[in-house]
Amino acid sequence: MGRPPPCAIQPWILLLLFMGAWAGLTRAQGSKILEGRECIPHSQPWQAALFQGERLICGGVLVGDRWVLTAAHCKKQKYSVRLGDHSLQSRDQPEQEIQVAQSIQHPCYNNSNPEDHSHDIMLIRLQNSANLGDKVKPVQLANLCPKVGQKCIISGWGTVTSPQENFPNTLNCAEVKIYSQNKCERAYPGKITEGMVCAGSSNGADTCQGDSGGPLVCDGMLQGITSWGSDPCGKPEKPGVYTKICRYTTWIKKTMDNRD
């Protein structure tokens, strides 16, 4: 557990890229909660939102008083993190906005190829510590990998319709289940690594544009970071794909310990 997948790009992956086999997939920049509903306010106290000015770019997950996990493809030159938010149109009592001090992508993440979703994970170090409480608190990292069929919660401010985009004002939640690795690989042949996990539902509940970097939480433990999926979103046979946290716990903890 905690050992990341190998970094090397296999020759067959390069062949697939050359042949255009990645067409129809999207790395959701900023990725929605389809077939969900408004979350109970502050029921996801670890939920973070990444902003450039007033523009929402991605979700994130608070994992320490100065640390947020998100997707590596969400990295920007200058941006901030909002915590304790529910409605994006009004200021919530626990809401706090903190500037990003450092963005640390996984060392194996491939910035040069936007269609390579491997190792899509990044730690953000905040300039100041968050004020923690019942409505703003870190989530626990999963010690074990998720089980097939396990029920999980996804959340975000991403679009609630696809392919047409319609962004909600409030945080949305939906329930999904963990898919087997075989089912995941059948949905996306040749594109799933051991550092990814799929989750979805028969009604099409899914993450989408605006949700990238947000949490997949199962039994109160962080099991995934929203990474990529099909376009349009919400196809039951094409589940959302998440960076599998249990494969990166060693890197996460080591990175945080070395910079605290």
Curated annotation (Swiss-Prot):
Signal peptide interval: 1-28
Pfam entry (one): Trypsin
Subcellular location per the Swiss-Prot or TrEMBL entry: Secreted; Cytoplasm
Alphabetized GO MF terms: peptidase activity; serine-type endopeptidase activity
Transcription regulation found in the keyword field: no
Keyword line: Cytoplasm, Disulfide bond, Glycoprotein, Hydrolase, Protease, Secreted, Serine protease, Signal, Zymogen
Catalytic residue list: H73, D120, S212
Disulphide-bridged cysteine pairs: C39-C173, C58-C74, C145-C246, C152-C218, C184-C198, C208-C233
Tissues and organs where the protein is expressed, per its UniProt entry: Expressed in the limbic system of mouse brain and is localized at highest concentration in pyramidal neurons of the hippocampal CA1-3 subfields. Also detected in spinal cord gray matter and in keratinized stratified epithelia of epidermis, hair, tongue, palate, nasal cavity, pharynges, esophagus and forestomach. In skin and mucus membranes, expressed in stratum spinosum and stratum granulosum. Expressed during estrus in vaginal epithelial cells but not stromal cells. Within the vaginal epithelium, expressed in prickle cells, granular cells and parakeratotic cells but not in basal cells.
GO biological process, one term: response to wounding
Regulation: Strongly inhibited by diisopropyl fluorophosphate, leupeptin and (4-amidinophenyl)methanesulfonyl 1-fluoride.
Gene disruption phenotype: Mice display marked abnormalities of synapses and neurons in the CA1 subfield of the hippocampus with enlarged and elongated pyramidal cell soma and reduced asymmetrical synapse numbers. Mutants also display impaired spatial memory acquisition, increased hippocampal susceptibility to hyperexcitability in response to repetitive afferent stimulation and prolonged recovery of UV-irradiated skin.
Glycosylation sites per record: N110
Prosegment location in residue numbers: 29-32
Ranges of residues in domain Peptidase S1: 33-257
Matches recorded under InterPro entries: Peptidase_S1_PA, Peptidase_S1_PA_chymotrypsin, Peptidase_S1A, Trypsin_dom, TRYPSIN_HIS, TRYPSIN_SER
GO cellular component, one term: cytoplasm
Gene3D superfamilies the record matches: Trypsin-like serine proteases (2.40.10.10)
Cytoplasm is among the record's keywords: yes
Function per UniProt: Serine protease which is capable of degrading a number of proteins such as casein, fibrinogen, kininogen, fibronectin and collagen type IV. Also cleaves L1CAM in response to increased neural activity. Induces neurite outgrowth and fasciculation of cultured hippocampal neurons. Plays a role in the formation and maturation of orphan and small synaptic boutons in the Schaffer-collateral pathway, regulates Schaffer-collateral long-term potentiation in the hippocampus and is required for memory acquisition and synaptic plasticity. Involved in skin desquamation and keratinocyte proliferation.
Family per record: Belongs to the peptidase S1 family. Kallikrein subfamily.
Quaternary organization: Interacts with SPINK9.
This protein's name: Kallikrein-8
